[in-house]
UniProtKB/Swiss-Prot annotation:
SUPFAM superfamilies: Actin-like ATPase domain. Belongs to the UPF0285 family. It comes from the Archaea. This is UPF0285 protein MmarC5_0962. The lineage of its organism: Archaea, Methanobacteriati, Methanobacteriota, Methanomada group, Methanococci. NCBIfam families: methan_mark_12 (TIGR03281). Disulfide bonds: none annotated.
Length: 325
């Protein structure tokens, strides 16, 4: 059995080829590269396309579907629209359309939004959107890797999304625009709201630079800002303050969900969550009274492949989300 998982992230598209539960290869294409090259031609370097049994696909916000759905049944790529989602480059759209126009079987993974009925109704009442599809994939990877039925998953990268899993189902959480900051994205504070009202900046532009990049004022584009801030932690005061502030913000978000999970299992993921120098996970552990673990790199793509594999093995729901395939 050969499956492929797709993670549509802020900085690019990551794909995982898995055969009989074993990861065979992982590759990443920057969004700018996808605009010039075929994703399927790149994938063909790693696997015979005719041998793929199923692909698990993440795309954008995933707010147009509420089940894990056969790509043939999905309209408008599974989104309501592409507004208010951060910087749009177009690479993910090309990948999705290539996959849909091919004959490769695929399912589209939804995001977590108010129409996903498996979540606690209070979170649906509070927030229109909680997470994009790859966060479900990351959660499923964590669920399969560590075997916990109850845990908090915090994915820290360009943005931060923190989710709570209870009794093997996604219970709720906090979206990138609500709670903790990431490197690029974050919630809007008073100054940004005033700038939006004054028409100095759009809400989407504000969200896209409301992360700790606002501390360093060193925006280098979607792909390079992260490295610029993290690599200068020890020799630049603003970069140190930015990372320390991010750690505080994420720790606060995790702790706010801790009372809902007596098992106190916390799993960190994302490029910043697994960053080793500075060691972000150790910094967060100092603020958390719980069992803090770190998930493997490229966890979203691997999780998407795990979802595809288990669907082929007959699973009818993933973390409480129904499968329509």
């Amino acid at each position: 059995m050969i499956v492929v998982g797709i993670d549509h992230g802020t900085s690019g598209i990551t794909a995982c080829v898995m055969e009989n539960k074993t990861v065979k290869s992982i590759f990443k294409m920057k969004r700018t590269e996808i605009n010039e090259n075929s994703f399927l031609k790149e994938l063909e370097k790693h696997v015979n396309l005719n041998d793929i049994d199923l692909m698990g696909v993440c795309y954008s916000m995933g707010d147009g579907i509420d089940n894990i759905t056969d790509i043939k049944k999905v309209d408008n790529r599974g989104v309501i629209n592409l507004e208010g989602i951060g910087k749009k480059v177009g690479g993910g759209t090309r990948v999705y359309d290539e996959i849909k126009s091919s004959n490769i079987p695929a399912v589209v993974i939804p995001g977590l939004h108010k129409d996903v009925k498996s979540m606690d109704e209070r979170f649906n009442a509070l927030f229109s959107h909680i997470a994009s599809p790859e966060k479900i994939s990351i959660c499923y990877n964590a669920y399969k890797t560590f075997g916990f039925e109850n845990f908090i998953l915090s994915d820290i990268s360009s943005n931060t999304v923190t989710l709570l899993i209870k009794n093997g189902k996604i219970f709720g959480g906090f979206d990138a625009c609500v709670g903790a900051v990431g490197i690029l994205h974050g919630p809007l504070d008073l100054e940004l709201i005033r700038n939006i009202d004054a028409k100095k900046i759009t809400a989407n532009e504000a969200f896209s630079k409301a992360g700790v990049v606002k501390v360093t004022e060193s925006y280098k584009g979607v792909e390079d800002t992260k490295f610029e801030i993290m690599s200068n932690y020890k020799n630049n005061e603003k970069c140190k303050l930015a990372v320390d502030s991010l750690v505080l913000s994420v720790s606060m978000e995790i702790n706010s969900l801790m009372f809902l999970t007596p098992d106190k299992n916390v799993i960190l993921a994302g490029s910043i969550g697994i960053w080793e120098n500075p060691n972000v996970s150790e910094m967060i552990k100092e603020n958390i009274d719980g069992n803090v673990l770190v998930l493997n790199e490229e966890s979203g793509a691997i999780g998407s492949a795990m979802i595809a594999e288990d669907i082929l093995n007959g699973k009818k729901d993933i973390l409480g989300i129904p499968v329509d395939f």
